[in-house]
Amino acid sequence: MSEKASDRWHGIERPYSAADAARLRGSVHIEYSLARLGAEKFWRQLHSEPVVAGLGCMTGNQAIQTVQAGLNAIYCSGWQVAGDANTAGEVYPDQSLYPVDSVPKMVERINNALLRTDQIHHMDGKKEIDWLVPIIADAEAGFGGNLNAFELTKALIRAGAAGVHFEDQLSSAKKCGHLGGKVLVSTGEAINKLVAARLAADVLDVPTVIIARTDADAADLLLSDHDPRDARFLTGQRSSEGFFYVKAGIEQAIDRGLSYAPYADLIWCETSKPDMAEARRFAAAIHAKYPGKLLAYNCSPSFNWKAKLDAAAMKQWREELAALGYRFQFITLAGWHALNLSMFELASAYRENGMLGYSQLQQREFAQEGAGYRAVKHQSFVGTAYFDAIQTAISAGSHSTGAMAGSTETEQFTSTVKSGPKRVVA
């Protein structure tokens, strides 16, 4: 971050100076290579590609499959971390109940998986795929106040996140955007969280992409009535807990989006249904004041898509949204649903047909090799040959304990497929 604005920082406001960030940085410069690489790559994608599409991944292997299949970003969902991938080892609903280090640990896990895959392919001279795609991480409502948001952003950058998003809910009452009982903080408090995230990125000297999410379309409770920007949405009623009732809806969401725009790189309005007219209205209102402002859209599994849209509309949905400025689109809980359905289907087939049920899955894996799928050869996939190469280098080629030679995979899993389709990320 410099005093002189560059194209990267066009339209972004900071209530602090470059000198403030430098003073907080310390005397030792630490380079966060993965976070910087991802942030710069994500920013280029947002400005050079019609749409950046990502799936929510909850394991490193899901991330590898996502990149292998040709997608160019990964979303790290707090819901999925709560549901089955948190450091407490618990199953939680999406209410910020998990330990605060859980999403950073998931980002690190995903980056480690992508790095290992890159190492395996680099060793074999395969360079057709750029495995290190940007990871956009869910910082929820910041797990507290401004300082909590500051520290969480730093942890996500250290883990290698390219972008982070913060929502405008009250952290202690945070809910999934598609649950009831959501409480908004004041517009000013939400802005302070965005400033805290930006300051954290500037202190670590990484151009992290900051996304502001508003839940104001559905949230009808407000923590405090002190901010004049929120006044026109107050109903005059109070809840039993002392919260202020507000008029939820797209007007409140637009007002929040306009307030957040100077402090965030993208704006995300959490919606309750896939509604193109509503998406168009939100985009038009933001762009009337902030032309070209980048937008994000959650293509949520909480929507019953077939009940809302026909096949043609679903097929065109992504491109129509992109034309409105929604350049980053993602399916938040894709990994959770894919994991659960695939395991249920396998268990059902195995119960009914024994090993035939498993073999049918294996044959589907073989059939996908032509498209680039590699996990059917699980020993190679996780790097057995890579670690054989390390052993060979250490012993100058004189060892008899190599793992791949003599393996059942080498003997039984031959293939004529050399590689999948090429996909290069700039």
Where are the model-predicted features located?
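Alpha/beta enzyme core
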Residues: 6-33, 37-45, 54-303, 307, ...
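N-terminal phosphate-binding or glycine-rich loops at protein starts, especially the Walker A/P-loop
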Residues: 50
